């Protein structure tokens, strides 16, 4: 029997617990209402389990709040022939223990071997970020199902990466035909996350990656380069701007967006983005950047965004790529802002970047990825290394959190199951970085995402995600398969000539 994520300590004992006989779950009056509701869902999911208030039954599932467990989600679980006891100092710890027991019951044929588990996560904050701004916005049904599955994997945060896919009242031009989430949708997701002990953290890019707004003429006045720019990476002309000009008018626009968006969330944190302001210093702010330096101009506007969010009662998270380009700038950051260190390739210098943040006393998360985007089938070898390297570096330098990113670059062509391996691996790496689930990965996918109904499909998902390893030719942040299918046919990419027919066959 495998558990996802694997527990820190698990010891077997003699005897077995019969899982076919009726198994009462004791819900006493002292349990918080949210946990009692979770118990009701637990009983509905497991046929032999039923709810009772009687604490004197000889065989039962008992939940105990005790102050002996360090850490908010630390818990112990003990199984004997007479039942199960789950103990924690917090209701969230009891909920995580129920998640472990649920996985055990779903895998048991008729009984579970007696054992004792003692568990605590490596990272206090363990989240998933879903990209809902690159051509795919999941339905509410899909998002709710994912929330339940993420809770099963013991994630406790969720972010929905948003550029233009929220239905802001005064900005229909931006979100028309984009299937945006409405305010009522966010409230529904907030309630579902809260019920499953997940913090729904608002994520609204507020500086760069604003192209879905700035392409429209009525927003050109906010653009650093309203008539477009030459992309510094590709050298290709971009027809419209992607970065806000760092002005009071831009700040006022963002303030109005925050006023409508942030009150929908219970979280006191907001991810304001800030990554990849490609054309900053090439247009409106060119002279200022020449005088003061681009990093200083960037930091000034970033700090103003953080001050704005603070006035609205929110702490901020921001992508750390720009400040890491100039480590001396780390001393100029707001003390209550959290840097998000992102990198998606195996071998990304998480260790070095985490050390820089730690030395500057900047709170930070590590943010690896599922390696699903630009891939078609996934990149399992890269994802595994990337996710575990981030966890190792983050743990070494006391990162405050771990965020698994699932992007949709260039059209979001990957299907959702391509991301499943990364979700399972990320849960394992962030809860128990010393563990490995690589050999049982398909079992975890089948258990959590396919309800144990499709082991062959789970095997195929894992097999397909290993396809890129068969090709010697490598491309960064993508696969050959993806690039051969989606490329501008007038000009063959340089790397395509390196692929032999033998490799393709």
What are these regions (language model features)?
Residues 1-22, 28-29, 33-36, 148, ...:
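Substrate-binding groove of N-acetylhexosamine-processing glycoside hydrolases
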Residues 4, 100-123, 151-159, 218, ...:
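Conserved oxyanion/phosphate-binding beta-strand-loop segments in alpha/beta enzyme cores
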Residues 115-133, 365-374:
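N-terminal small/glycine-rich loop or linker at the start of catalytic domains
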Residues 56-58, 166-169, 173-175, 327, ...:
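Beta-rich nucleic-acid/ligand-interaction surfaces
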Residues 123-320, 331-332, 338, 394:
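Substrate-binding cleft of carbohydrate-active enzyme catalytic domains
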Residues 91-93, 135, 164-167, 206-209, ...:
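Solvent-exposed loop/turn segments at secondary-structure junctions
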Residues 1-126, 389, 412, 449:
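Contiguous, structured surface segment used for ligand recognition
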